[in-house]
Amino acid sequence: MAEANERSKEMARSNSCVFPRDLLQRFISNSVEGEDDDEEEDDDEIELNLGLSLGGRFGVDKSNKLVRSSSVVVTMPLFREDHHHHQAAAMITTKVSTETVAGATRGTGLMRTTSLPAESEEEWRKRKEMQTLRRMAAKRRRSEKLRTGVGGGNSNNPEEAATATASRRRGRPSSGLPRWSATANKSGLLRQHSAGLDSLQVSGESLGGGRAAGSSSSVSELETKASSDEARSLPSTTQPQQETTTKPTNRLRRLSSVDMNMKMEPQGKGKSEMPCVFTKGDGPNGKRVDGILYRYGSGEEVRIMCVCHGDFLSPADFVKHAGGPHVDHPLRHIVVNTSSPSNLL
């Protein structure tokens, strides 16, 4: 028995060194605690009601008040000494706040909960790995699409793919022509140059891959030749464009002239049937008189309208009107005026 008591004392000392002590238990006995509880109950029953309102409430609410719940629950081991029975320390769970110590006996406190469950490190790593795998797959697809787009589905040769990617980075098409010449190819201006370059490239590829340096130099020479030929062909191409721009105007002019001729056809017929004529008198009072040969048919007399008076005269009278003598053949003295402005109308 003595050995057991000594061992229990040693355990108590070791526990007292490790865990904090509840020092109030030394001065307060179990009987005193019971008396304090009775006094608290008596104090609760006493009401000091003066008929005043506190915040709109009259009297005292006798209902049990809500117990404040703590957001954090902590298990704290305390070693309590009992004066009546010196026994080993026991592990008890208490709450941090003093208010919750009183409410723990009446009801259990609310445990704090989180809105989202905490992820473990394994799940986080798995998710990151999946994201990296998806990104790698997307990059691989992108590179495959670029290769197939450049090589046209036949990109088995890595050198061709490399040259194609280099030309694409430089901003030039795969045919070796500049960007502006590629746009000209669409309009059909440089098809001959591109065909010649393609044939030369095919012949260079058929020679073999052992002459990489020579092929690169030949390609550069071809590019320079193509650029010079294109620069020379530019003025020649601009000339047809200018011709095409001038052609519509010429066509319009022709059409307008045709329309004018078509409109003036009846007037031309009238002029051919009624030409302008003039005559000059041989006498001292001779003068030039203009007239219009009026239309006449077979078996009718020839009449000329005088421009100065508007009278219809016979050829002999027209010659006399100009101051000439009487002649046997007056028509020989009358001249048709082809250069008069009336004929040009």
Curated annotation (Swiss-Prot):
The keyword Nucleus applies. It is found in: Nucleus. Residues 123-132, 222-232 have a biased composition (Basic and acidic residues). Pfam families: EAR, NLS_NINJA_AFP, TDBD. One of its GO terms (cellular component) is nucleus. One of its GO terms (biological process) is abscisic acid-activated signaling pathway. Transmembrane segments: none annotated. Disulfide bonds: none annotated. Residues 235-249 have a biased composition (Low complexity). Induction: Up-regulated by abscisic acid (ABA), glucose and salt. Keywords: Nucleus. The keyword Nucleus applies. Acts as a negative regulator of abscisic acid (ABA) response during germination through the ubiquitin-mediated proteolysis of ABI5/DPBF1. Belongs to the Ninja family. Forms a heterodimer with AFP2. Interacts with ABI5/DPBF1, DPBF2, AREB3/DPBF3, ABF1, ABF3/DPBF5 and ABF4/AREB2. This is Ninja-family protein AFP1. It comes from Arabidopsis thaliana.
